[in-house]
């Protein structure tokens, strides 16, 4: 299902500002209205996420807390407790997104709804602007659930299992699969 959705978005993103916006929403795990496309500051940064839509810096960065023990020892030795990945975006995405500034907000909303309805025809669930940004993270969490379940069924101890490294590598793997298709 996710591969089907990503394929549609990737195929159309080169030529359609709306598809570029939806694709960027999925890739950056951010609702499209919260992307810096519609703001004066073209960079948004929070504790775990950074989105930049500047001409020389078009990327998003996501980080995950990897330590279950945020104690003094880790801080004292400055051990890396965060795993992160950065995905640069092609320049034409930025050019497409800048075209959206010429459009009215109501027009953008209606076009997004129109495109989501077209995508929904091939789905077994309702794709919305709210669940679209969670698409990749939900896939990763589902796969993580299967991995944990298989470890438990195999009788392995999962008390000290830390999924952090899994997230960053798996999401990149998933994106690579989408790009290749």
Residue ranges, per PLM feature:
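Short, flexible loop/turn elements at secondary-structure junctions
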Residues: 26-29, 42, 57, 144, ...
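Short, basic (Lys/Arg/His-rich) helix/loop patches that form interaction surfaces
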Residues: 8-12, 104-152, 156-160
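Conserved tyrosine-mediated DNA breakage-rejoining catalytic core shared by Y-recombinases
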Residues: 1-8, 28, 37-82
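A short acidic (Asp/Glu
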Residues: 35-36, 140-141, 161-165
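Active-site/catalytic core of tyrosine-dependent DNA strand-transfer enzymes
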Residues: 67-126, 135
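The alpha-helix within a helix-turn-helix
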Residues: 25, 36-39, 150-151
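Catalytic-site neighborhood detector that most strongly recognizes the C-terminal catalytic loop/helix
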Residues: 153-181
């Amino acid at each position: 299902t996710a591969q089907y959705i990503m394929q549609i978005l990737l195929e159309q993103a080169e030529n359609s500002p709306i598809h570029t916006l939806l694709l960027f929403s999925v890739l950056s795990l951010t609702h499209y209205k919260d992307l810096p496309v519609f703001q004066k500051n073209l960079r948004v940064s929070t504790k775990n996420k950074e989105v930049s839509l500047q001409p020389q810096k078009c990327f998003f960065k996501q980080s995950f807390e990897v330590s279950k023990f945020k104690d003094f020892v880790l801080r004292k030795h400055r051990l890396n407790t965060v795993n992160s990945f950065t995905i640069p975006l092609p320049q034409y995405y930025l050019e497409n997104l800048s075209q959206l500034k010429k459009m009215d907000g109501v027009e953008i909303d209606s076009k997004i709804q129109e495109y989501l309805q077209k995508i929904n025809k091939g789905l077994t669930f309702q794709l919305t602007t709210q669940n679209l940004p969670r698409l990749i993270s939900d896939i990763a969490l589902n796969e993580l659930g299967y991995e944990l379940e298989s470890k438990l069924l195999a009788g392995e101890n999962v008390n000290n299992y830390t999924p952090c490294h899994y997230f960053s590598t798996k999401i990149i793997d998933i994106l690579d699969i989408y790009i290749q298709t």
